[in-house]
From Swiss-Prot:
This is Large ribosomal subunit protein eL30. PROSITE patterns: RIBOSOMAL_L30E_2. Belongs to the eukaryotic ribosomal protein eL30 family. The lineage of its organism: Archaea, Thermoproteota, Thermoprotei, Thermoproteales, Thermoproteaceae. The gene is rpl30e. GO terms for biological process: translation. It comes from the Archaea. Keywords: Ribonucleoprotein, Ribosomal protein. It comes from Pyrobaculum islandicum (strain DSM 4184 / JCM 9189 / GEO3). One of its GO terms (molecular function) is RNA binding. Pfam families: Ribosomal_L7Ae (PF01248). One of its GO terms (cellular component) is cytosolic large ribosomal subunit.
Length: 101
């Protein structure tokens, strides 16, 4: 099983990750990220919006099994993160989340 927190930190430090609802939505519309991660407590409207555009773009969506506070902590950020998009996973194996989901 993939350690989500560790792989997320590796992806942030060695790859390219975009954080925040607006930035993730913009990334899905303008380019194709490899993976979108949503916090489990994301508002319904935000979750539906991101999932809709991700489905149109063929991007897998992973629901992080924790709150936006926990997702922020997993990313080693001092704030909440509702959504993030992995554009380049770098040396991480975060894309294996899709295989296990």
């Amino acid at each position: 099983m993939v350690d989500i927190s560790r792989e997320l930190q590796v992806a942030i430090s060695t790859g390219k990750v975009v954080m925040g609802f607006k930035e993730v939505k913009k990334t899905i519309l303008t380019s194709t990220p490899k993976l979108v991660i949503l916090a489990a407590n994301a508002p319904k409207w935000a979750k539906e919006d991101v999932e809709y555009y991700a489905k149109l773009a063929g991007v897998p969506v992973f629901i992080f099994p924790g709150s936006s506070i926990e997702l922020g902590a997993a990313a080693k950020r001092p704030h909440k993160i509702m959504a993030l998009a992995v554009i380049d996973p770098g040396q991480s194996e975060i894309l294996k989340l899709v295989e296990h989901a």
